[in-house]
A protein has these predicted regions:
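P-loop NTPase motor domains
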Residues: 66, 73-92, 99, 103, ...
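Post-Walker A helix-loop "phosphate-sensing" segment adjacent to the P-loop in P-loop NTPases
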Residues: 476-486
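Hydrophobic anchor at the beta1->P-loop junction of P-loop NTPases
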Residues: 458
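Conserved P-loop NTPase
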Residues: 744-787
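Extended, folded cores of ATP/NTP-driven motor/assembly subunits in large transport
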Residues: 1-421
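A short helix-turn-beta junction within AAA+ P-loop NTPase domains corresponding to the substrate/partner-engaging
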Residues: 502-506, 716-729
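Conserved lysine of the Walker
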Residues: 466
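Hydrophobic positions on the alpha1 helix immediately C-terminal to the Walker A/P-loop
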Residues: 469
Length: 787
């Protein structure tokens, strides 16, 4: 064990905490018994090993949820079989306990995660409105409960020295078993285990847990003094008091001939504070088989006795009590399972701890839990004069003081599948709101930057809420983060929101006086190539759109354009002043000066965009493209110019991303009607390039489209799907549903969430997590009106 380093000096705050702990530690009842005396462990070490008794040592692993209830049947079967294998890992020398803690959190716990702090600017009223919306959504769900799951395992050993290596070996095996199931898990250290015990003992008051290992030596206190409640009261046989909370522990009597995998999930869906504890002890296989064989022998003996009686009484010897026949066949089936079907025997103690603020509420909570048990032909029975032992057995310590055990095989034990539905509620500073989990009613708050690939897609039929979802994310991102936002808006939908956020709407049309120069060059334009090479590549794409036709540019034409591009930037590169930036006309004039007839052909094709009626892109830039939120409105560009407009916007985005990269700032780029970009080979290739390279540059692109078929008809587009770890899928048309199911591996059950779904309802793909969501944004808000 590593010795704990002690501080030389304690701060004044530390001393205050220790004095408070000493005051609590000195509280005793008339018999001189303190609350600490009831807590059944001897010592907790900083690495998380706990000595429960002279020779029993335990460790605790916290594990996360996976989507079991949402999975299709074959996936459910795979999870169930994986869980059976997991249980079979435990031999009779390892006692283990599954603990499910649903504890009420203080309002501040969640309020801090969802509030958007005011910044004393023109947007504080919107921030306040958004925070209120989140608080209302939070109140609707059961996010008032913090739900955690633990596996505590323990072994007998003569000393901590002997226990430690063995516990570490078992810990590694358990973590690997969880990994095989796709479940995230981690081992708790000593302070984290104490924190969890403190949370159970202090349900009545949201006291912060304050403890440091180096407080123990100077104070003479034990770890129990920092976690014990103000008092325990076990006076009545059927319930107890812990501080100001009332509680009662019941055990589950399993009477049903067949168990259902929803039983545990239904307990955990209750909206009151609750702890479910399952103590499981594997029975030695040889002993289990011997016991069953002995039972079969006893049953056979009873059967013979009954047959003798029948012969003596003169009736048919085949008529024996039906119970005997049933028990006999069941015992033989059990023996067969143990001998040839990879089943083991387990002894299970299933405890449920309900708590409440008063006895009446406690009665209601227990009645609700009892109703769930009855629904599955089981019975929840209150422990009689064993409430103290029951409470201590519900702590994630790995100690079972209740000797009420039910023998079950592996598959019967595994039916209590500890997985229900995944949650996506991240506490990070930049976690944004994406709706409510349709399965659990909990808020979905995630930060796309934490994904391996933050690129995203928003997909849905017209009217399903695509643009609204994008606008909601833009508003949330603007109010909460310092990211820049760029929008390519082919339908002129985003202006009200952008203007309210004091952004810049750049309206590009043949009649507009807003100009963007496609020849603008940023000297930081590329990371590993010269800025000019990448700019040349862009201008080649632009010329290909203008000149190319079906065959695209010929090699000679490409060479001429590349030569002219390098010449046209000479003056600017020698003296990089804004007025030296070339425009399209400079390139046109250079092409006219070239000798090759191909150069004249390209120049003639460019003429309409330079001196003709489509010369909107032949001007120096005159708009503020440095605003934090920029929207390129290209609705009125017309068919001829729209493709070019989209390509120019993409080039502007690259410029912005490279500037922001140097400033360590993220850039979010939203492309509405994205399928339009993918119809042309040049814009499609450029878009795929963005999806491949943006992440390295701190860019987060989001494509918004209704035409999944168009999206997938492009040869390049599969790269976009492969490089998008975030997909926000709203209602889908029949044909599109099948394409997406194949592309993203969606089950039939999951597809039901995007089949004839309402506005703002669908499926969220976040990395490997799939969740159904609902987002009904309040309509009586300023934000709703501008979105």
């Amino acid at each position: 064990m590593q010795p704990v380093k002690t501080k030389k000096k304690l701060s004044r705050a530390d001393k205050k905490q220790i004095e408070a702990a000493i005051a609590r530690a000195n509280r005793t009842d008339k018999k001189g018994k303190s609350a600490q005396d009831s807590i059944p462990y001897e010592r907790m070490w900083p690495d998380g090993i706990c000595r429960i008794s002279d020779s029993h040592y335990t460790k605790t692993i916290q594990f996360q949820d996976i989507n079991y209830q949402l999975s299709q049947n074959e996936d459910k079967t795979a999870i169930f079989e994986g869980w059976c294998d997991f249980l079979n890992y435990f031999d009779s020398s390892i006692h283990f306990q599954l603990s499910f803690l649903n504890l009420a959190a203080s309002e501040e716990t969640f309020a801090n995660s969802i509030s958007i702090p005011p910044q004393r600017d023109a947007f504080d009223s919107i921030r306040e409105e958004y925070t209120t919306m989140l608080q209302n959504q939070l109140a609707r769900g059961n996010n008032g409960l913090i739900k955690t799951k633990y596996l505590t395992f323990g072994i007998d050993a003569d000393s901590i020295k002997a226990a430690k290596p063995r516990l570490e070996r078992i810990e590694t095996d358990i973590l690997n078993n969880f990994k095989r199931l796709g479940v995230a898990a981690r081992t708790l250290d000593g302070k984290e285990r104490l924190f969890q015990l403190h949370a159970v003992f202090h349900m009545d008051e949201q006291l912060p847990f304050q403890f440091e290992w180096d407080w123990l030596a100077p104070s003479g206190l034990s770890t129990k003094d920092f976690i014990a409640p103000s008092s325990f009261e076990f006076r009545t046989g059927k319930q107890f008091r812990m501080g100001k909370k009332y509680g009662a522990v019941s055990f589950l009597q399993i009477l049903a001939p067949e168990l259902n995998d929803r039983l545990l999930a239904d307990f955990l869906d209750m909206e009151s504070s609750l702890i479910v504890s399952m103590h499981i002890q594997s029975v030695d296989q040889v002993k289990a088989i011997k016991t069953v064989k002995r039972k079969i022998t006893d049953l056979d003996r009873s059967k013979i006795e009954e047959q003798k009686k029948a012969v003596r009484a003169g009736y048919d010897m085949d008529i024996i009590p039906s119970d005997l026949a049933t028990y006999g066949s069941e015992a033989k089936k059990l023996l067969q399972d143990l001998q040839s079907r990879n089943e083991r025997m387990f002894l299970l103690t299933f405890l449920v701890l309900n708590t409440a603020d008063n006895p009446r509420q406690l009665g209601n909570n227990i009645f609700q839990a009892g109703s769930i048990a009855q629904k599955y032909n089981c019975q929840l029975t209150r422990l009689d004069f064993q409430q103290e032992e029951g409470l201590m057995s519900c702590l994630p310590l790995g100690l079972n003081q209740i000797e009420i055990q039910r023998g079950l095989t592996t598959s019967s034990t595994a039916i209590f599948v500890p997985f229900t539905t995944q949650e996506l509620f991240q506490n990070g500073k930049e976690a944004l709101y994406y709706g409510i989990n349709a399965l659990s009613n909990n808020l979905i708050m995630v930060d796309r930057k934490l994904l391996k690939n933050p690129n995203g897609l928003i997909l849905g039929t017209p009217g399903s809420g695509k643009s609204f979802s994008a606008k909601r994310e833009i508003a949330n991102c603007f109010l909460l983060t310092s990211d820049d936002v760029i929008i390519c808006d082919p339908e002129a939908e985003y202006a009200p929101l952008v203007e309210r956020l004091h952004g810049q709407v750049i309206k590009i049309s043949p009649t507009s006086t807003n100009y963007i120069n496609p020849m603008d060059l940023n000297l930081d334009y590329s990371d590993d190539e010269s800025p000019l090479s990448l700019k040349s590549d862009f201008i080649l794409s632009l010329c290909e759109l203008i000149v190319g036709g079906k065959e695209g540019l010929q090699p000679v034409q490409k060479t001429i354009i590349d030569r002219c591009v390098r010449l046209v930037y000479n003056e600017y590169l020698n003296d990089p002043k804004p007025e030296n930036m070339p425009i399209l006309e400079d390139l046109y004039n250079l092409l006219r000066e070239q000798e090759e007839k191909e150069a004249q052909y390209i120049a003639t094709a460019l003429e309409i965009y330079v001196t003709g009626s489509l010369n909107v892109f032949n001007h120096q830039s005159n708009v503020d493209i440095d605003n934090r939120i920029v929207c390129y409105d290209i609705k009125e560009l017309g068919k001829q110019l729209k493709k070019i407009g989209m390509l120019v916007v993409q080039d502007q985005v690259w410029n912005r991303v490279t500037i922001n990269r140097a400033a360590h700032k993220s850039t979010r780029y939203y492309i509405d009607e994205m399928h339009l970009l993918l119809k042309e080979e040049q814009t499609a290739a450029y878009t795929v390039e963005i999806w491949k390279r943006f992440r390295k540059w701190g860019g987060i692109p989001t494509g918004i489209t209704q035409n999944v078929k168009d999206l997938l008809s492009s040869r390049e587009v599969e790269n976009i799907f492969e490089n998008s770890d975030f997909v926000y899928m709203l209602n889908q048309a029949g044909g599109d549903r099948q394409i997406l199911a194949k592309q993203l591996g969606i089950s039939t059950h999951q597809l039901s969430y995007v089949t004839h779904s309402g506005e703002g309802e669908g499926l969220l793909f976040y990395g490997s997590t799939i969740l159904p969501f609902v987002d009904h944004f309040p309509k009586n808000t300023e934000l709703y009106r501008i979105m």
